[in-house]
């Protein structure tokens, strides 16, 4: 896969000092902490976009899915980032795994009957699946990450088979995807409350760059619409009826707060 997205850390280090110290929930944090918060939010947003691209490809290319489509979309997103083999993409995967872990922790890792029936795996499982594929793809590069998640050496060794299966499956299905998809990118106004989230998302450039990957990397029928908007919930969607990836500004805000809650203030 092409490395199209700009070095995120460099962009955010330029953005972070420009943010007012009292900007929404970033008051009381140092410039470095603010940069870390923004990096985490953008990297999780990036993983989410690739997850929605996974749904798009499953829909438009009629990709076979055995099991939950949500798990398949996570695996496609992880595979795309692993294929880039860059420090930025590796950091994005680490942040995505941590994002699922922190999300689960914020709900006390509660997963009731309705959750099990919903089609989504538990957040902690999604985090560990990402890490398993990481260490399965490159044990020397990601051993420390897997150890930090308390994945046993025995399981780390078998993660290689998990990765090989995903690589063979996804790589084979997307081997000759073509090029030339029509893609339209739209940013809608976020409003005053979500101004910071909109600014962070726009400045990161990830929306245009993932859209460009779809444009150059696949030949899909019709026009694919990328829309960033206010949704009244922290989420992202793929709508097969309109062939549209919808990203909610509230998700950026939620991710910033999620990471900020883990940091001490005033350092």
PLM regions: where:
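Catalytic zinc-binding patch centered on the HExxH motif and its immediate surroundings
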Residues: 24-26, 226-264
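Active-site recognition of the HExxH zinc-binding catalytic motif
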Residues: 47-60, 74, 78, 247
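Pan-zinc metallopeptidase signature
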Residues: 112-214
């Amino acid at each position: 896969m092409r490395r199209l997205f700009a070095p995120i850390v460099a962009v955010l280090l330029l953005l972070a000092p420009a943010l007012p110290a009292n900007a929404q929930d970033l008051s009381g944090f140092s410039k470095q902490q603010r940069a870390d918060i923004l990096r985490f939010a953008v990297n999780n947003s990036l993983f989410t976009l690739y997850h929605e691209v996974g749904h798009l490809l499953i829909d438009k290319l009629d990709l076979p899915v055995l099991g939950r489509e949500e798990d398949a979309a996570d695996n496609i997103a992880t595979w795309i980032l692993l294929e880039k083999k860059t420090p930025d993409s590796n950091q994005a995967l680490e942040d995505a795994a941590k994002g699922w872990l922190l999300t689960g922790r914020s709900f006390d890792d509660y997963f009731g009957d309705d959750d099990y029936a919903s089609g989504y795996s538990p957040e902690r499982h999604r985090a560990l699946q990402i890490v398993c594929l990481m260490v399965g793809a490159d044990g020397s590069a990601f051993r420390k990450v897997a150890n930090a998640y308390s994945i046993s050496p025995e399981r780390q060794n078998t993660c290689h088979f998990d990765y090989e299966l995903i690589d063979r499956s996804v790589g084979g299905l997307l081997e000759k995807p073509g090029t030339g998809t029509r893609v339209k990118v739209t940013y809608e106004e976020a409003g005053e409350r979500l101004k910071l989230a909109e600014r962070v998302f726009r400045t990161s450039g990830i929306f245009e760059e993932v859209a460009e990957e779809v444009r150059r990397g696949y030949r899909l029928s019709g026009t694919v619409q990328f829309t960033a908007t206010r949704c009244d919930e922290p989420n992202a969607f793929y709508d097969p009826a309109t062939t549209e990836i919808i990203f909610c500004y509230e998700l950026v805000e939620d991710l910033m707060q999620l990471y900020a809650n883990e940091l001490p203030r005033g350092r």
